[in-house]
Amino acid sequence: MYAFVRFLEDNVCYALPVSCVRDFSPRSRLDFDNQKVYAVYRGPEELGAEPESPPRAPRDWGALLLHKAQILALAEDKSDLENSVMQKKIKIPKLSLSHVEDDGEVKDYGEEDLQLRHIKRPEGRKPSEAAHKSIEAVVARLERQNGLSLGHSTCPEEVFVEASPGTEDMDSLEDAVVPRALYEELLRNYQQQQEEMRHLQQELERTRRQLVQQAKKLKEYGALVSEMKELRDLNRRLQDVLLLRLGSGPAIDLEKVKSECLEPEPELRSTFSEEANTSSYYPAPAPVMDKYILDNGKVHLGSGIWVDEEKWHQLQVTQGDSKYTKNLAVMIWGTDVLKNRSVTGVATKKKKDAIPKPPLSPHKLSIVRECLYDRIAQETVDETEIAQRLSKVNKYICEKIMDINKSCKNEERREAKYNLQ
């Protein structure tokens, strides 16, 4: 039976007879522990012998060295192991350190192994500057203790011979040099880390002060925006009062359209006609009403313009400025008015001999802008963005008028086609 083993010292795998494993007699192919460290003799071919040299018998392997190895697989024939290796069926498990350290059998390497270890150790050891410095320190200390002088009574060879018994002191000095260098390196790293930490604390304090200043500026900016909005409302109300005093109320449109004008009550109309004959008459200013108040299922948008409450709530959930503006324009003017109006009252340049349509009332356009402004102000406080979005109100209303006219023309075509049939 053959064993596929992995030597721990050089991590090389070989297929060897089970007789190469000391004190190992497997009964089957699974009778081994892959987590155990075995003592294995290496054969001559694994030691780098010449191919012509005859293989040694198992009884002659005692002269060879024992090596720590891990058994990975067992097989009846060597070719079976080779096939398993080629097919990658053999896996190398991880070996815990406890099995390597607690293996007492592997520590007995025999006298020849110990002799080789003692022979190779001095040859493989190279002197270093630290060792020379330590030897010189020991020699100097011995000279001070014994009152010796290198220039008079001793030669360098004798000094080193006398210093050789103090190898323990040399080792202690050498051990003391390494922690000192390590201590200095750690001290430098610690000082560097302290400097970096001090720098980071300064940066953190500077950032904190900047954040506090930004928070104060943002608070002041919010107060200014609120004040500006309040001033705009007061300005609009003042304009309404002035228009009423001049006799042209903002709720009176240029054309008498039922959907966009508010007729005064009969009593007020008679009062106006009676007092208009006197030279000192001024129309009484109408009470200025707050925006977005509810009354009998209506919502007040300002300047005496009321819209349906249910439609207003549906408008608040509308997505996008374009759709919001178009729906609000339909709620204020109605499709019948919009299709016969234009935003500015100027004829289009796309058609020759185009007849200009009456413009939309400016104060109602201002109401549309104010409603859109209140909506945008809830999303952002950037005045540049607000102004940019408000500048598209006329464009949105113009697009809505074009859509209404287009749908009306399509409806007329369908009716004409139906009548022809």
Swiss-Prot record:
One GO BP on record is: negative regulation of DNA-templated transcription
Annotated InterPro entries:
BEN_domain, BEND5
Q: Which residues constitute the cross-link Glycyl lysine isopeptide (Lys-Gly) (interchain with G-Cter in SUMO2)?
A: K258
Gene Ontology molecular function: DNA binding
SMART domains linked to this entry = BEN (SM01025)
**Keywords annotated in UniProt:** Acetylation, Coiled coil, DNA-binding, Isopeptide bond, Repressor, Transcription, Transcription regulation, Ubl conjugation
Disulfide bridge map = none
The UniProt record lists the keyword Repressor: yes
Indicate the segments forming the BEN domain, all copies: 302-408
A Pfam family of this chain: BEN
Function of the molecule: Acts as a transcriptional repressor.
Q: What is this protein called?
A: BEN domain-containing protein 5
Organism whose genome encodes this protein: Mus musculus
- Write the lineage as a comma-separated list: Eukaryota, Metazoa, Chordata, Craniata, Vertebrata
